[in-house]
């Protein structure tokens, strides 16, 4: 059954074939073949983006590792400046393998890959995964980012199921979780993205179960991103915490 909330729109006739292939892959209608939908995937010369269609809707969101905030940040990433690096246990001579079990738009995975980690990105919502795949493909063509992007490996599927099915041999050193929660960040970008995301996926109601699956699999630690003043996920006390202004990282040492 197709998702009646989303349709696909293409900007020019030369993109029609690609749009039709994407529609078939995601089981979504093209915009002209359905009634108005709350969300629309837009395929144009800049890549793939996702937008709400309401009259008061913010602009579209797109995964862009090359320019904008992520491109600026990538040039300035360092071990000392990244609390995430400390949370996952990156050291001068050590780069753990990481599974980002809630990949979303790939920002935290990109930071970890920029610091030298091999990162498996798990995203269960196929539309978000399509946005991420498009961003990775475009970034891989940038000479300055090619090595970083090569360390990012996207898997579309449910994180809990994927973790439960792992064999003993390829267990990751670290599993990272950033469950969907109401952000306190009031920036226009965060508000725009959260509005689109909540329309599409809502909150991560199964985050406690995913945490349990992660704790059973991670060789070294599980890291959970939380609002600074929130209770630990599932009330489970972490081994230690890395605090920040609006968020913190709860670290669960497993080995």
From Swiss-Prot:
Enzyme Commission code: 2.1.1.242
Region (Disordered): 228-247
GO annotations of cellular component type: cytoplasm
GO molecular function: rRNA (guanine-N2-)-methyltransferase activity
Top class in the EC scheme: transferase
Reaction catalysed by this enzyme: guanosine(1516) in 16S rRNA + S-adenosyl-L-methionine = N(2)-methylguanosine(1516) in 16S rRNA + S-adenosyl-L-homocysteine + H(+)
Chief place where the protein resides: cytoplasm
Keyword Methyltransferase: yes
Keyword annotations of the record: Cytoplasm, Methyltransferase, rRNA processing, S-adenosyl-L-methionine, Transferase
Binding site residues for S-adenosyl-L-methionine: 107-108, 123-124, 178
Localization terms from the record: Cytoplasm
Summary of the function given for this chain in its UniProt record: Specifically methylates the guanosine in position 1516 of 16S rRNA.
Family classification: Belongs to the methyltransferase superfamily. RsmJ family.
Descriptive protein name: Ribosomal RNA small subunit methyltransferase J
Upper classification of the organism: Bacteria, Pseudomonadati, Pseudomonadota, Gammaproteobacteria, Chromatiales
Gene for this chain: rsmJ
């Amino acid at each position: 059954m197709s998702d009646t909330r989303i349709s696909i729109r293409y900007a020019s006739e030369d993109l029609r074939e690609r749009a039709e292939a994407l529609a078939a892959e995601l089981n979504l209608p093209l915009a002209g073949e359905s009634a108005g939908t709350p969300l629309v995937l837009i395929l144009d010369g800049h890549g793939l983006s996702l937008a709400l269609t309401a009259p008061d809707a913010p602009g579209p969101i797109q995964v862009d590792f090359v320019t904008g905030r992520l491109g600026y940040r990538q040039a300035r990433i360092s071990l000392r400046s990244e609390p995430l690096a400390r949370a996952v246990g990156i050291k001068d001579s050590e780069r753990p393998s990481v599974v980002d079990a809630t990949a979303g738009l790939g920002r935290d995975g990109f930071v970890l890959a920029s610091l030298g980690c091999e990162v498996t990105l798990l995203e269960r919502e196929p539309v978000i995964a399509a946005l991420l795949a498009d961003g990775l493909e475009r970034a891989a063509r940038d000479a300055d980012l090619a090595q970083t992007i090569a360390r990012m490996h996207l898997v579309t599927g449910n994180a809990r199921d994927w973790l439960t099915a792992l064999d003993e041999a390829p267990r990751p050193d670290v599993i990272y979780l950033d469950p969907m929660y109401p952000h306190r960040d009031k920036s226009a970008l965060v508000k725009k993205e959260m509005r689109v995301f909540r329309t599409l996926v809502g909150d991560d109601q199964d985050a406690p179960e995913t945490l349990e699956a992660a704790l059973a699999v991670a060789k070294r630690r599980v890291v959970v991103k939380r609002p600074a003043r929130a209770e630990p996920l599932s009330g489970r006390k972490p081994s230690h915490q890395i605090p920040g202004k609006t968020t913190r990282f709860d670290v669960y040492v497993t080995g």
